[in-house]
Structures are given as C-alpha cells and as structure tokens.
Amino acid sequence: MTSITILYDTIRLEEKLLIESAKKNNITIEMVDCKKLFIDLDKNSHDIQTVLQRCVSYYRNIHSTAVLEGQGVKVVNCLNTGIFAGNKLFTHMLLKKAGIETPNATVAFSKDAAMKMFDECGFPKIIKPTVGSWGRMVSKINDMDSADGIIEGKESMHPIHHIHFFEEFVQRPPRDIRVIVIGDNAVAAIYRNSADGNWKTNTHLGGSAETCKITNE
C-alpha cells in the first residue's frame, strides 16, 4: 500500500479533501504537524519517504522542505517551487520569462528609489510585500504623502520589507478570477468578489467566492 506523509501547520478544507481522496484510493496518509516537529539535521532519524508539503507559513514551508530534501525525502512541491511560488517578485519574473502577461510591476531597493519612481511614474500604485498572503500589508498608494508614510514604516521592519514591490492599479469590475492551472490546462476557477467599499478581493478580508465555469477563453 502506498504511504504518503502530509506535512501541515493548519488543517484547511484542502487537507481534508486530500485525506478523503487518499482513503478512496487506498493510500495510507500520515499527518505530521510541522509545529510539533523537530529533526536532527545530521541523522536520518525518521522513516519518511514521500511528503506532500502543505504548510501555509512560507518560511516554515521552505525550511522544512530543505531539511527533508537534504535527507533524501521526496517532497511535493520541491524546494525550488516553494521558494519561487511564495515570492511575488520571483513569480512575476518567471511569468514574464514565460511570456505570460501580468500587471506592470516595479521594484525599488530603498525609500529614495521608491520616491523617485513615484515622481517619474505617477499614481496610483499597489505596494505589496514580496512574501505574504491574504491581502496583508497590500496598500493602494494615491499620492506622495501616503507613499512617504507607508514606505517609511516598511523601512523600519524586517529587511524583506525593504524590497519595495509595486504593481499598476488595474481598473476592473469589483471582482477578479483565480484559475488553477496544471501543466497547460486550466482545471478550475473561481470569481473573487470585493466586499462593499473594498477594492481587494481576498476572501480573508471579507470578499466572497463563486464558481467560474472553465471555457475556451
């Protein structure tokens, strides 16, 4: 019987569906809470062979993957995928290299450079942390005063926040479309609708989701 370890830090619907699917396909699942896990880096003191990496935390995810891969464990997704997929700037450059259209983006490596960018490129801009999710620390900057305050605050945080990543503000209906792609095939999609008075569509911030039918478009 096939055996797979699911490494997690939060049990969500997706993990429950994976467990249910494993049972239907006669696959043994071992659930391991990464928050309770410690590993001797110099000894292979476990019998884990294949891991589905499901940690929500980016740093917990990539560091635990690095450890397990270093000990010969097959991890899905692999370390390289985890690093790139969890960083918006890295992902943007991969999409650009692949010829996939994305909102125009700019990066500045200091407050002075960021303010110069605003002076030359204008407003509005969306500022996002390169690492993060659920719409946290994502702001729409409309003028120099708000730019100065937001970037000044980020400069006092962890060095990851000193990488100032900006995207154009896309004028759209109060919804966007999130599509799941496997290989070259779009397999599922949802509409994400903004909550009243909020331009963000994150469901974590009050947005709502509904089914989006996959079409040739």
Regions found by a protein language model. Name each.
Residues 35, 55-56, 130, 169-170, ...:
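Anionic group-transfer/hydrolysis microenvironments
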Residues 15-17, 61-64, 87, 136-137, ...:
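Short glycine-/acidic-enriched loop or helix-start segments at secondary-structure transitions
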